[in-house]
Amino acid sequence: MAFNFNWSPLMADAGFYTRAQDLLTAALNKSPKPPIIVDDIKVTELNLGSIPPDLEILEVGDLAEDRFRGIFKMSYNGDAFLTLKTRVQANPLNTFLVTRPSFASPKPLAAAAGLTIPLQITLSEFRLSGFVVLVFSKQKGITVVFRNDPLESLKVSSTFDSISFVRDYLQKAIEGQLRALFMDELPAIIHRLSLRLWVPEYRDRESESVNTLDQSSGPGQDPLASPPQDPVDASGNALNPSEVASLSLDSGVEIHSLFSQKNLLRLAALTDSQRTLSLFTPSIKDVVYRAWTASTELGDSNTLTSPASPVLSRAQSHIGSLHSFVDNASTISMQSGGSSNFSGHGLNLRSGRHPRPHGKKRKKRVVDLRRPKTTDDMESVSGESVFSSENATSAPTIFSSPAQFSEEKNDDPVTPPLAPQNDLHLPTIHERRRISQGEHTLTRRSVPSMSEVAQPSSSRNSAAMIADTWPDPDATPRNSIRLPSSDRANNPLTTAHLPSSAIQYPPPIPDNNDPRQQAWLSKMAAELARRIQEEKVGPSGSRPFPDFWDDHSREEIPPPAYGH
């Protein structure tokens, strides 16, 4: 057996829907709500639709004129819908940042209070199927009890449909609430509605309670009762007290433009303080933004750099290396003077347009660290003298501590500084070979040769000092050859006076125990010196290869410094 319901009287009665909305609102707020919902749930719209449910009688227990009791199987697949409004708490530090790009986000750091967002939910496309126990009585109304969970599915449409995880969460939460509603609250709501329809006493008692509630609430407060101190209109013009008094809630004047000028300035400053590129950045209450703290952090770092200070690029760092290292003292002084102009910006070389290194390999620069030629060097090369008279008196020797070699400071961060401008000349390999040969001759022979007699005494002294300082790199390792103590005492080279700052070592103790060894060594040294002298001077008294010896007597011109 089946029943056909006439749904038209329910749709025609406007009071029925109003009362049903109030009952549903009270039922939804009565049950424990999830913590995300921070406001009351209000039913704003209710419509049962035009399709009634289907009931199938399974059992009839009691049947009379004023009462009925039976068990039914109910199924519903209609067009009823329900609209709810509430406020939910959102987390601005998580949901807002996920849905916004980084350049348009105010970047909140912390929130002291929760953010409440209005939420509108529409429930539609109900699918119900279950067993219902129905009891009807004119004195007690209608009682409906579900033996199982009737809710199969429904559609939830909300404000957050564009956010997938919020939509899924609301779907699950509302389905859980509706299951509890059908099992507990819906039978009570149906019972109260039936009492209002069939029991007049209950209807009168309920109307009296509603009237007393309206009287206790009283009239609403007028927000214009206390106007601001300096009101302005929408154009920013100040308003007189008479114009403010003429305004009312029902007038056509724009009430929303009536704000204090101080409040407008504060709101403008608050909007500008977020410092984002988005034109519609929402304001979140009790939230600290990163842009607010960044201004104080940048304040300290701005004091270190000046906006007017120039920034050198990578191309400008090669200016110091454009000068060629010519053996000229004026050129080198100009080089050091030109490079000192960049001493103030040495730390800013990496802060130009190219902060990252390029893939191109850096070129290695070969810097000529040799001292430029002077007239003193030319004299030393020709063999007349190794040191000039000025250098011998004023220049520091190799035995003293290094002094300030130049007053000019080379602060070029790219080109390394030149070698100290010593007045002490480093002899070439040929000079040191000639000096070592002369030393062997003086050491092995008691009578000086013709070439040694021709040289001045100052040249011999200088040659001896250089021979002691720079040993011959081409000398063949031999046994120790030392002069006897008597010859060493008479030798003027060994008694040369050294400066006071020189590090003097005690002379080695000669080994005089074997006279035969000394005689053999003296004979070998004299023979070697004689052969070398005969090779230089031919049998006829002239050199056999004058061009060869002249070329080796002159100092070789050092090659120019390599470019970069």
Curated annotation (Swiss-Prot):
It comes from the Eukaryota. It is found in: Mitochondrion outer membrane. GO terms for cellular component: ERMES complex. The keyword Mitochondrion applies. Residues 209-219, 438-462, 477-503 have a biased composition (Polar residues). Residues 380-390 have a biased composition (Low complexity). The keyword Transmembrane helix does not apply. Lacks alpha-helical transmembrane segments, suggesting that it resides in the membrane via beta-sheet conformations similar to those predicted for other outer membrane proteins and porin. This is Mitochondrial distribution and morphology protein 34. The gene is mdm34.
